[in-house]
């Protein structure tokens, strides 16, 4: 099976995996912990194994790190985890000043599969909810908690100012 290991964290809301990428100390584990507090399940922390499965990419924990999450100031904690979930969203961590208000839909590719990609300021109070909404929207589902369905497609926007489609 084709795969690669990436420096990231991953959580899942149901069957939707969210890969959280960023530099060391950027807040990946902290955001994953807040996602778990909001109902997500840990997949992996610090390193994530990505595998191609048909037309999807699945995320898995390395065996030595399975069920472990680093909590800064506390240490390594053991949590329930999933061993494999399809990725629905990739989140790149950035500062609040660098995040566009109404960004064009972004895409990333792993193992030849395109996956929706967004930028998030990890320490904003709303970051966990933003990720959950974006993950459900990326796979065309309404969020089960709020019923909200975010508009990821430029044609779904109400401002009428967006041009073009995502690039292949």
Question: Model-flagged regions — what are they?
Answer:
Residues 87-168:
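Conserved NTP phosphate-binding and transfer environment spanning the P-loop NTPase/kinase superfamily
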Residues 5, 83-85, 112:
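A short, structural micro-pattern
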Residues 1-11:
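Pre-Walker A adenine-sensing motif
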Residues 37-95:
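Conserved nucleotide-sensing/catalytic segment adjacent to the nucleotide-binding pocket
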Residues 8-10, 47, 105:
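Short, acidic/polar N-cap/turn motifs at the starts of alpha helices
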Residues 11, 15-36:
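Glycine-rich phosphate-binding P-loop
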């Amino acid at each position: 099976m084709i795969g690669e290991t990436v420096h990231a964290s991953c959580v899942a809301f149901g069957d939707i995996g969210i890969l959280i990428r960023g530099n060391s100390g950027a807040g990946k584990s902290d955001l994953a912990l807040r996602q778990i507090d909001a109902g997500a399940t840990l997949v992996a922390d610090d390193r994530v194994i990505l595998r191609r499965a048909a037309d999807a990419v699945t995320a898995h924990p390395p065996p030595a790190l399975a069920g472990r999450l680093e909590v800064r100031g506390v240490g390594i904690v053991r949590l329930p985890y999933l061993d494999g979930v399809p990725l629905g969203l990739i989140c790149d961590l950035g500062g609040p000043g660098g995040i566009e208000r109404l960004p064009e839909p972004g895409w990333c590719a792993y193992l030849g599969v395109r996956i929706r990609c967004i930028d998030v300021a990890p320490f904003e109070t709303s970051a966990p909810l933003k990720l959950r909404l974006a993950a459900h929207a990326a796979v065309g589902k309404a969020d089960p908690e709020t019923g909200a369905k975010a508009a990821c497609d430029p044609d779904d926007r109400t401002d009428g100012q967006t041009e073009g489609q995502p690039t292949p």
